Amino acid sequence: MTDLMEVKEKLALSCRLLYREGLLDHGGLIGARIPGDSRMVLNPRTMRGTRGRHPGIMSAEDLVVVDAEGKKIDGINDPPSETPIFTGVFRKRSDVNACFHLHLRWATLFSVVGRPLVPVFHQAAVFGEVPVHQDPNLIQTDEQGRAVAETLGGARALLLRSHGTVIVGEDIESAFTASVLFEENAVRLYDASLLGEPKVLEGKERDETAKRTWNEKVISKIWNYYILKAQSEGLIS
């Protein structure tokens, strides 16, 4: 399997898994760089023959390949309107090879009320301080994409105020895992806030916890768990 085909297959699988977990809706986008290449693979604006896209049935053939500037190179579908998120982030962050733009329900709520989304769940220690990008609009221009990348800085995730999230990873598996944990932390922080004042993971404690809960072994375990879960329910073969 070529690098391009492997990226396409993993990205399409991520679409289906994220949809199964309620994390990827009709407007969410995920993309990845092809190893050793400036090209990117993205889920499309719409799926051929339709007026929309359904991540639950996304296949490798549905995905679109674009260059570093977001121009279409290959694919039966067209790039999404928010492609500048990906061109901006990938241009800024050489360590990032996968970028997910998700409209996470619980995480996004924190940007709506202006409350910091802090790590309270041990597997969310990797996020640390989460920046908030104040532009709530669709990110459709190069200028907006660059601004998102500037707000993200060296973080693993950011909140787009009243819009959604941008979550990045060294590869598709890590971006997927980070997305699951980011939303789980938001749910736990919300629930804990109903009971009292949450104890935040910070400083040395957070750093030490992140070292133990965010590594290749943990990422692989979580990625494979969701694959097996979907297989056990007959959603993927």
Q: What residues fall within each predicted segment?
A:
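Glycine-rich flexible loops
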Residues: 1-237
